[in-house]
């Protein structure tokens, strides 16, 4: 009798734990963050194609899209462009680009975006005209509020000297941020040295006009928008009734996938003190930008990893990054076909590499694990909505 009673208690405990697990999964906030890096966006593009393919297989749905699974998708520079591609609706209110269309986009348009050199010593390397043209063609008149999920795209206003973050959830307080997606995408990609800054205005319903003078979002997030995306997700969890059980900064109920565009094992380029001693201001400016981007990426990953580990939620965070780029693959504007093919190979090879030295799990296996969580959560939410 005692054995039977103990068995029943055990069953109740298992059911309670299972119910709690599913409830936790259902209310988990899912976040996708994509780094900047110019043409190196091909690397996360390759990873996204794999992830979306896994979701389609698991849900037996060829029309499944990443925006169906992530509560927040954020990006800066080329990552902001990818964010727009997979969240901007087409005429059927579905993402205008599937993940398997990202890499072909770079192959088709990259050589033109990074080919219209101004030829000026003083001024940006490229005029940005083709970039704006293709953004207007692809994104049309779509504005932030129409995005299919919450977005977080960063830029920096050189007139106000403040970062500008474009999100859906902030429009009630700041309606002037409901800009056209092509203006936002050009702004977040307008890297100093490479493209001209972007000026545009928005008009609110009460007739107010707001002016923007924007440059690359990497100035605000230093290339890695993961912390920004996580901050937006935290605010979403606090304000959206669907996540009422989530406490502030409860990373146990956060699922974060952060995609890098690759870096060298130390920095994009390495130097010696003897070399640097001969540099002038311009050479230092270029080197500092490269060093800052690389160092910031490492520190952001270190900080997020530490926080998730402290909350015993390390499996809820995955940083996918290639840290051993060499040669032309380190360049953000080498859009030659040969280099783009190399970048595809980098992404495909990365999938087979271990996530860390201490873990035998490969990125491919980790992404499949994430895909399973995303798929199960979507099904749980769909079941709840049907009641």
Curated annotation (Swiss-Prot):
One of its GO terms (biological process) is lipid catabolic process. Tuber. Residues 1-23 form the signal peptide. Residues 322-385 form a coiled coil. InterPro entries: Acyl_Trfase/lysoPLipase, PNPLA_dom. Its main location: other. It is an enzyme of class 3 (hydrolase). Glycans are attached at residue 115. Its EC number is 3.1.1.-. It is found in: Vacuole. One of its GO terms (molecular function) is monoacylglycerol lipase activity. Residues 32-230 form the PNPLA domain. It comes from the Eukaryota. Keywords: Coiled coil, Glycoprotein, Hydrolase, Lipid degradation, Lipid metabolism, Plant defense, Signal, Storage protein, Vacuole. A motif (GXGXXG) lies at residues 36-41. GO terms for cellular component: vacuole. Patatin have a dual role as a somatic storage protein and as an enzyme involved in host resistance. This is Patatin group J-1. It comes from Solanum tuberosum (Potato).
């Amino acid at each position: 009798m005692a054995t039977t009673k103990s068995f029943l208690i055990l069953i109740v405990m298992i059911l309670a734990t299972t119910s709690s697990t599913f409830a936790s999964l259902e209310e988990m906030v899912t976040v996708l963050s994509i780094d900047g890096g110019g043409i190196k966006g091909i690397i996360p593009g390759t990873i996204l194609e794999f992830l979306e393919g896994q979701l389609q297989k698991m849900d037996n749905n060829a029309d499944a899209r990443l925006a169906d699974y992530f509560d927040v998708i954020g990006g800066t520079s080329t990552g902001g462009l990818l964010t727009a591609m997979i969240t901007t609706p087409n005429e059927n209110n579905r993402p205008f680009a599937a993940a398997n269309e990202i890499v072909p986009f770079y192959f088709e348009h990259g050589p033109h975006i990074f080919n219209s050199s101004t030829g000026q010593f003083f001024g940006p390397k490229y005029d940005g005209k083709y970039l704006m043209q293709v953004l207007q063609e692809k994104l049309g008149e779509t504005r932030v509020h129409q995005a299919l999920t919450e977005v977080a795209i960063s830029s920096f206003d050189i007139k106000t000297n403040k970062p500008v973050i474009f999100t859906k959830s902030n429009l009630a307080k700041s309606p002037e941020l409901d800009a056209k997606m092509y203006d936002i995408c050009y702004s977040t990609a307008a890297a100093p040295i490479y493209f001209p800054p972007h000026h545009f205005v928005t008009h609110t319903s009460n007739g107010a006009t707001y002016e923007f003078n924007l440059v690359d979002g990497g100035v605000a997030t230093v290339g890695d928008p993961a912390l920004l995306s996580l901050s937006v997700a935290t605010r979403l969890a606090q304000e959206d009734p669907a996540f009422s059980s989530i406490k502030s900064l409860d990373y146990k109920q956060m699922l974060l996938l952060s995609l890098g565009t690759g870096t060298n094992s130390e920095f994009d380029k390495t130097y010696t003190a003897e070399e640097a001693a001969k540099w002038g201001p311009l050479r230092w400016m270029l080197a500092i930008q490269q060093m800052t981007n690389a160092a910031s990426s490492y520190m952001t990953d270190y900080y997020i990893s530490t926080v998730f580990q402290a909350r015993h939620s390390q499996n809820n965070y995955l940083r996918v990054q290639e840290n051993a780029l060499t040669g032309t693959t380190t360049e953000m504007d080498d859009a030659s076909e040969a280099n783009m093919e190399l970048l595809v190979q980098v992404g495909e090879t990365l999938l087979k590499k271990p996530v860390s030295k201490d873990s035998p799990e490969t990125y491919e296996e980790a992404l499949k694990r994430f895909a399973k969580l995303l798929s199960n959560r979507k099904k749980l939410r769909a079941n709840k909505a049907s009641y």
